[in-house]
Amino acid sequence: EASVNGPEMIKRGEIDEATIGSDILDSWLSDDTTKDMVSMDRPNTNYTYFYMFNFMPFSHEFSNWSVEGMDAEYEPENWAKAINNTNFRKSFLYGINNSVTLAVKAPEGYDNYKLNTITPPSFCANADGVDYLKCGDLANITEFFDEAKAKEYRDAAIPELTAAGVTFPIKVQMPYNPSSTDWDKQCQVFKQQLEGVLNDGFDFIDIIITAGPSDSFLSSVRRNGKFAFLLCNWGADYSDPQTETDPFYQAEGARGSRYAFLRTGVEDGFITGDTADAVMNYMKAIEAAVEITDDINARYDAFANAEASLINNALVVPMGMSIPAYIATRLNYWEGQYASTGFSNKRL
């Protein structure tokens, strides 16, 4: 009941906390009886969000479970050809304006939450006190959003995709969890923004927003391969860049529960050509970085180079940090335990 009627229940003193969605935030802030109850939740700085492409859109058997893959109505065969094209993926990397979607959840200010990397700033520093994001090739990564460049990649991709037998517009299934506050609104804004860029002058993509189940969303959607493009997140478990590789890295022959199954895609022939080369270069770079245990600067540079290659090859698209919800609360979270990684910051 609290998840549905929380704002009214906290007014009546029946619960201690309720999330205030963007649709009612303005009215709560302008009402003298409620404005002092509203604040942003304590930031969860170890969680970052990024968009994942589904490189394995077909049914697939693993040793411990089966992946169903995308439904036929979303044309998985067409998507599989498109996703193997680097220029196609880079049109997304440069075409997405994260400011627009972040503004849905942070109408009072979103700049501090936008990321061009997977690892957040101030996550860790090397032996010289240099922030990890200033190490190696990550130091060269800046804002990606560039409409002109996105269209250049799109225009380069069109003849390549046509030669591969791709039909346009390319269907892009983008699910959301209806129980997550404002995720549906973010998807609508995302669709309008990206299609506005990439469909300017050519019917390039058709983003199809689908509502997943409120319960068991990850098992039903992400782990089941029922998406083309999906907003995912990851929370660091410890303060070393190796923890940020968990959603992407797979050991040789591994069938672990990873977000993208990049190595599986190469090993089983879903991912080919330049994309396969980029995937395997990343895997080898991570394996080399893990072995560096006696030189923190060299270790961080190696991980930074690997993360930069993952992003620059558009195998993943960074989005932002976890944006604290606006809440009405009778609790003081700032009095609770805190750690920048793990779950100590969730204890009261």
Residue ranges of predicted features:
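Append "and occasionally in soluble cytosolic enzymes with long acidic Gly/Pro-rich linkers
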Residues: 79-198, 305
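Bilobed periplasmic-binding protein-like "clamshell/Venus-flytrap" ligand-binding domains
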Residues: 102-105, 156-178, 279-330
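Ligand-site clamp/hinge motif
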Residues: 1-28
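Ligand/substrate-recognition segments at binding pockets and active sites
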Residues: 1, 12, 140-148, 155-236, ...
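Paired acidic/hydrophobic, glycine-rich loop segments that form the ligand-binding mouth/hinge
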Residues: 16-22, 228-232, 318
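Sec/Tat-exported extracytoplasmic proteins
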Residues: 14, 29-33, 55, 95-109, ...
